[in-house]
């Protein structure tokens, strides 16, 4: 049972307000995407990586990230779609012929560079035994449900978790979930949701609050602080 990473990096990053897409912004001398790929490259149990990027950025990703930083595990760079879900489906289809049905696929945002090898390993172990694994952290704040500006409920905080990535599944499970969602024109907010709607069980893997998704200038400030902390 091999392990492959599928790394969506096709976002446009409008909230960042930068002239280039967020995955290529420089963090401590390297693109954010390069930091993320380094974690998978260095994980001995990860056998290969597929990166998803906008079609017109494939040469840039290949030349300035994959080849420049020597990511030898990258098996393919795949063109993204209109939405993240479409991009992931493109990636899963591109994996056909390379991965087996029971291989574990770690789907991880290209702009989450602080994921740890330990988290990857624990998510992989769960995905081998269950229908899927979702890395998440407990909610710290009280969450309200609201309609038309009026609070309609307060879910018990102990039941609320903030979803992160990676989200890990066996290839046959996640491929089927995405194909069915695509055929039914259902658009979910994450990969686990597509598996859940088929009646399958996705287990929580406790993550790390530092595993942030870098989408705003404020996130870049946090990321730089995390790097300084790690270097200390």
From Swiss-Prot:
Bilayer-crossing regions: none
GO-annotated biological processes: isopentenyl diphosphate biosynthetic process, methylerythritol 4-phosphate pathway
Pathway(s) per entry: Isoprenoid biosynthesis; isopentenyl diphosphate biosynthesis via DXP pathway; isopentenyl diphosphate from 1-deoxy-D-xylulose 5-phosphate: step 2/6
Keyword flag Metal-binding: no
Database matches in Gene3D superfamilies: Spore Coat Polysaccharide Biosynthesis Protein SpsA, Chain A
Its EC number(s): 2.7.7.60
Lineage: superkingdom: Bacteria
Molecular function terms from GO: 2-C-methyl-D-erythritol 4-phosphate cytidylyltransferase activity
Signal peptide: none
Site residues (Transition state stabilizer), renumbered to this chain: 15, 22
InterPro entries: IspD (IPR001228), IspD/TarI (IPR034683), IspD/TarI_cytidylyltransf_bact (IPR050088), ISPD_synthase_CS (IPR018294), Nucleotide-diphossugar_trans (IPR029044)
Keywords attached to this entry: Isoprene biosynthesis, Nucleotidyltransferase, Transferase
Site (Positions MEP for the nucleophilic attack): 157, 213
Reaction(s) catalysed by this chain's protein: 2-C-methyl-D-erythritol 4-phosphate + CTP + H(+) = 4-CDP-2-C-methyl-D-erythritol + diphosphate
Family to which the UniProt record says this protein belongs: Belongs to the IspD/TarI cytidylyltransferase family. IspD subfamily.
UniProt xrefs under HAMAP family: IspD
Annotated function: Catalyzes the formation of 4-diphosphocytidyl-2-C-methyl-D-erythritol from CTP and 2-C-methyl-D-erythritol 4-phosphate (MEP).
The protein, known as: 2-C-methyl-D-erythritol 4-phosphate cytidylyltransferase
Organism annotation: Geobacter sulfurreducens (strain ATCC 51573 / DSM 12127 / PCA)
């Amino acid at each position: 049972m091999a392990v492959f990473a599928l790394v969506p990096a096709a976002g446009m990053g409008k909230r960042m307000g930068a002239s280039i897409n967020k995955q290529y912004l420089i963090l401590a001398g390297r693109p954010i995407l390069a930091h993320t790929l380094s974690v998978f490259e260095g994980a001995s149990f990860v056998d290969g990586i597929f990166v998803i990027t906008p079609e017109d950025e494939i040469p840039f990703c290949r030349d300035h990230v994959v080849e420049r930083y020597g990511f030898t595990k990258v098996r393919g760079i795949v063109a993204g779609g209109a939405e993240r879900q479409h991009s992931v489906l493109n990636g899963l289809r591109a994996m056909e012929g390379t991965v087996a049905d029971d291989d574990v696929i770690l789907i991880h945002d290209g702009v989450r560079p602080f994921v740890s090898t330990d988290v990857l390993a624990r998510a992989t172990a769960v995905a081998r035994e269950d229908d899927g694994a979702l890395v998440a952290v407990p909610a710290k704040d009280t969450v309200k449900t609201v309609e038309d500006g009026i609070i309609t409920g307060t879910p018990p905080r102990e039941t609320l978790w903030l979803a992160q990535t990676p989200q890990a599944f066996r290839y046959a499970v996640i491929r089927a979930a995405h194909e069915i969602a695509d055929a039914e024109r259902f658009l979910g907010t994450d990969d686990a949701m597509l598996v859940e709607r088929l009646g399958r069980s996705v287990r929580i893997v406790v993550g790390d609050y530092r595993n942030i998704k870098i989408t705003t200038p404020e996130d870049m400030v946090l990321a730089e602080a995390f790097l300084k902390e790690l270097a200390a």
